[in-house]
């Protein structure tokens, strides 16, 4: 019995109790899906629900009385062996071995779809992350946002949301002029300009510009700078996209800030917000009255000299997302962007959206690496591409995804290079590789999931304590994915995979899949192969949500 099947069965029992007049609830108040969770103490049963505590007040009764009525009906469900009432009205449900074991076959049949749900169906989400300036290579700070942002997008999609992963290119403003000036100076053997960009990569970009425009040195500075700016920008974005691809991060949209300016979107945004009554003029400048929406001060949109501010571009960009039909806009920003929370929510409110529903600003903490070598090419930073070459994509992505975004993080390269259980990514990947190896060995020994074209599976044979433990973790996986999507916390998936890996290793050591020596293949062997393959599937599904590979061999 899967958690979903039990959830639907509880809902059906509730509806029957309401129809019979045993519980005084409107039928519309009965949820289609009732949340079930694994109790912390497995002596309290296989599954628990607090539905009685949720609905008792509406039914005009106390939770224990509500639970008593519901438990009588739950005991009649096929596969349920016991129902106990705990505390103020919690229902603890125990399923028999056959019902519990049936999950293994259900997982194998569901394949890559196991763990997906429709909780966020109908949600159209714009997920913006990384958005590094195109003036240099991606570094370690961007690495965490790339890993987290992509993992969040994946768990949202697994919960039914329509997600667009978007990279906002800050290609307008003074930093682009400084970037062009830095490349120009290198081309002409001049010192790095004040406030300019150092690093060998600037010289490399200069070489690319020279290759594309051999006569660039013959042009005047005024004529050369626009050419250099465009060519160096294109080359740097190509490098950024290649690095992201190597890291396994794919963006659906690369959105140019400069295009907002060129299309008149800034002026349009000011006009639209003025029509809403939120824009005013003062001191020759144009302001958005963000204090009406909880900001600590009003924000300038157009300076007195007629130049738009970055804030104006932020407003135009938000309106672009709104106009493109996104019901939810998620921004993943660094720790130095705390001040953006109120101003972005103020923009949303001024645009007529609900800042508690239509926009979400996630703030992450910085990450460091013990013993990392600074990149001379990039000017004393740790480059993402160097991290990938040094530690491997999987180790970096998994390590960054297994901690909450708002917790400071220091990566330990020595740990991540170990092929031991101390290394979390190795621990989980090895469990998957071990399960695939076990399946190959079982098949070589004559164990198949089918006999004469029919499935050979007897769930009641999965009655060992380690099998019950493993099944419990596999059964909890869908609710973990749903919670990770709801809270934007993919680390929940990583930690659960580690629990599954541990349970699998304990089961593997206790229960043989393949027969030994001349032993005959039995239904126990075949049924255990189903459980083994179910574990492989869940580990692979979970690793994929984190952007990490599931190796067949290690």
From Swiss-Prot:
EC number per UniProt: 6.1.1.19
Renumbered ranges of motif 'HIGH' region: 132-142
Catalytic activity: tRNA(Arg) + L-arginine + ATP = L-arginyl-tRNA(Arg) + AMP + diphosphate
UniProt-listed GO biological process terms: arginyl-tRNA aminoacylation
UniProt entry tagged with the keyword Ligase: yes
Record Pfam families: Arg_tRNA_synt_N (PF03485), DALR_1 (PF05746), tRNA-synt_1d (PF00750)
Cellular compartments annotated: Cytoplasm
GO cellular component: cytoplasm
Keyword field contains Cytoplasm: yes
MF terms in GO: arginine-tRNA ligase activity; ATP binding
Coiled-coil ranges (or none): none
Record's keyword terms, sorted: Aminoacyl-tRNA synthetase, ATP-binding, Cytoplasm, Ligase, Nucleotide-binding, Protein biosynthesis
Principal subcellular localisation of the protein: cytoplasm
Subunit note: Monomer.
HAMAP family listed in its UniProt record: Arg_tRNA_synth (MF_00123)
Entry's family note: Belongs to the class-I aminoacyl-tRNA synthetase family.
PANTHER family reported for this sequence: ARGININE--TRNA LIGASE, CYTOPLASMIC, ARGINYL-TRNA SYNTHETASE
Protein name per the record: Arginine--tRNA ligase
Species, as recorded: Pseudarthrobacter chlorophenolicus (strain ATCC 700700 / DSM 12829 / CIP 107037 / JCM 12360 / KCTC 9906 / NCIMB 13794 / A6) (Arthrobacter chlorophenolicus)
């Amino acid at each position: 019995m899967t958690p979903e099947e039990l959830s639907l069965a509880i809902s059906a029992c509730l509806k029957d109790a309401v129809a019979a007049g045993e519980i005084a609830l409107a039928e519309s108040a009965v949820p289609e899906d009732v949340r079930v969770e694994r109790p912390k103490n497995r002596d309290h049963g296989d599954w628990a629900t607090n539905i009685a505590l949720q609905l008792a007040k509406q039914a005009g009764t106390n939770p224990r009385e509500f639970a008593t009525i519901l438990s009588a009906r739950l005991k009649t469900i096929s596969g349920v062996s016991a129902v106990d009432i705990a505390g103020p009205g919690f229902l603890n449900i125990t399923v028999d071995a056959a019902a519990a074991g049936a999950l293994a076959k259900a997982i194998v049949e569901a394949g890559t779809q196991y763990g997906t749900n429709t909780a966020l169906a109908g949600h159209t989400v714009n997920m913006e992350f990384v958005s590094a300036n195109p003036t240099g290579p991606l570094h370690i700070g961007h690495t965490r946002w790339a890993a987290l942002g992509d993992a969040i997008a994946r768990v949202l999609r697994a919960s039914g949301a329509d997600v667009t992963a978007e990279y906002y290119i800050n290609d307008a403003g003074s930093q682009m002029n400084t970037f062009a000036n830095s490349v120009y100076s290198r081309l002409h053997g001049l010192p790095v300009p004040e406030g300019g960009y150092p690093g060998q990569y600037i010289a490399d970009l200069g070489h690319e510009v020279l290759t594309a425009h051999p006569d660039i040195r013959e042009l005047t500075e005024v004529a050369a700078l626009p050419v250099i700016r465009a060519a160096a920008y294109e080359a740097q974005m190509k490098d950024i996209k290649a690095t992201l691809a190597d890291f396994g991060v794919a963006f659906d949209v690369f959105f140019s800030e400069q295009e907002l300016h060129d299309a008149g979107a800034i002026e349009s945004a000011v006009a639209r917000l003025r029509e809403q009554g939120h824009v005013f003029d003062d001191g020759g400048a144009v302001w958005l009255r963000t204090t009406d929406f909880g900001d600590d001060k009003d924000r300038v949109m157009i300076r007195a000299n007629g130049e738009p501010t970055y804030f104006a571009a932020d407003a135009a960009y938000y309106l672009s997302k709104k106009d493109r039909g996104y019901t939810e806009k998620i921004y993943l920003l660094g720790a130095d962007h705390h001040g953006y929370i109120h101003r972005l929510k103020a923009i949303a409110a001024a645009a007529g959206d609900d800042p508690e529903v239509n926009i979400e600003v996630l703030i992450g903490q910085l990450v460091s690496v013990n013993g990392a070598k600074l990149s001379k090419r990039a000017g004393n930073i740790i480059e993402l591409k160097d991290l990938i070459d040094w530690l491997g994509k999987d180790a970096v992505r998994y390590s960054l995804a297994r901690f909450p975004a708002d917790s400071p993080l220091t990566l330990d390269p020595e740990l991540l290079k170990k092929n031991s259980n101390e290394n979390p990514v190795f621990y989980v990947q090895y469990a998957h590789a071990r399960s695939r190896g076990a399946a190959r060995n079982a098949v070589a020994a004559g164990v198949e999931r089918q006999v004469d074209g029919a499935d050979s599976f007897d769930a009641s044979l999965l009655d060992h304590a380690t099998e019950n433990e493993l099944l419990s973790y596999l059964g909890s996986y869908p609710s973990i994915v749903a919670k990770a999507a709801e809270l934007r916390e993919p680390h929940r998936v990583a930690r659960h995979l580690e629990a599954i890996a541990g349970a699998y290793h304990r089961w593997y050591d206790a229960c043989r899949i393949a027969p030994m020596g001349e032993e005959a293949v039995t239904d126990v062997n075949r049924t255990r192969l189903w459980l083994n393959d179910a574990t492989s599937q869940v580990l692979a599904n979970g690793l994929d949500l984190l952007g990490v590979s599931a190796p067949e061999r290690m």
